[in-house]
Amino acid sequence: MSRFIISSHSPNEEGNVVRVTPESAGWEYVGFEVYALTKGQTLRKETIDQEACLVLLKGKANIHTRHERWENIGLRMDVFEKIPPYSVYVPSNDVYEVQALTDLELAVCLAPGKGTYPARLIPPSEVGVEMRGAGNIERRIHNILPESKPADSLLVVEVFTPEGNWSSYPPHKHDQHNLPHESYLEETYYHQINPDHGFMVQRVYTDDRSIDETMVVKNGDVVLVPKGYHPVSAPPGYEGYYLNVMAGPVRTWKFRNDPDHEWVMESKLAAKQK
């Protein structure tokens, strides 16, 4: 298996099914966890020196922090309903407690925090929805925690790729601290597939090909993108979902397309406008 794939496993005692830490990934900023909680199960964590974005992938919950309480939040029961999710932002040096009111799949997105902003609910109405691309590179975007919304480090977005389409395309990268042209951001992809016995294909490669891996990705896999371009393809018959977490030294998303393939977007958009 590729060193960039972290596969999920059966839930442990606290419900964790996958965990990525900066130490395990060999980088500095991004952490990511998923919990599969049964109805009535409670998860309690301290954020310490990290901020967190709790994304209710499916199911309903009560979520409490040190100073806030949100009761009976959650709307979708499957990510492929394509309804924007409920999420909760939790600053560093705080505590969160999640009580599952139904079976619950919870993503915990982590990055260094400074405690600048208070805990807050991110309801579906505050999630920006857009269609990006055109033709067979069109995909649906839910901007959960974009750079226009307050946080110290985290950027969080989910993407739906129709069957037979590509996303994160044209291939782009953000691995150089070269503002305003490009920002350095580590990134994780948490994949789900409908139907769940299918697969996605993701390539991670650099200009010099010191990294060049094409991976078959299963439902529940996390793909690490430490650097390089990272396009995704959904085979016919299977639609893809992924949750992206990004963080780096500066909280801005500035990317560079692979110049060999940048023409594709221009061509697709021109065809769409005809």
Swiss-Prot record:
It is an enzyme of class 5 (isomerase). It comes from the Bacteria. Pfam families: KduI. Its EC number is 5.3.1.30. The keyword Ligase does not apply. Pathway: Polyol metabolism; myo-inositol degradation into acetyl-CoA; acetyl-CoA from myo-inositol: step 4/7. Keywords: Isomerase. One of its GO terms (biological process) is inositol catabolic process. It catalyses: 5-deoxy-D-glucuronate = 5-dehydro-2-deoxy-D-gluconate. Disulfide bonds: none annotated. One of its GO terms (molecular function) is glucuronate isomerase activity. InterPro entries: Deoxy-glucuronate_isom_IolB, IolB_Bacilli, KduI/IolB_isomerase, RmlC-like_jellyroll, RmlC_Cupin_sf. Belongs to the isomerase IolB family. Involved in the isomerization of 5-deoxy-glucuronate (5DG) to 5-dehydro-2-deoxy-D-gluconate (DKG or 2-deoxy-5-keto-D-gluconate). This is 5-deoxy-glucuronate isomerase. It comes from Geobacillus thermodenitrificans (strain NG80-2). The gene is iolB.
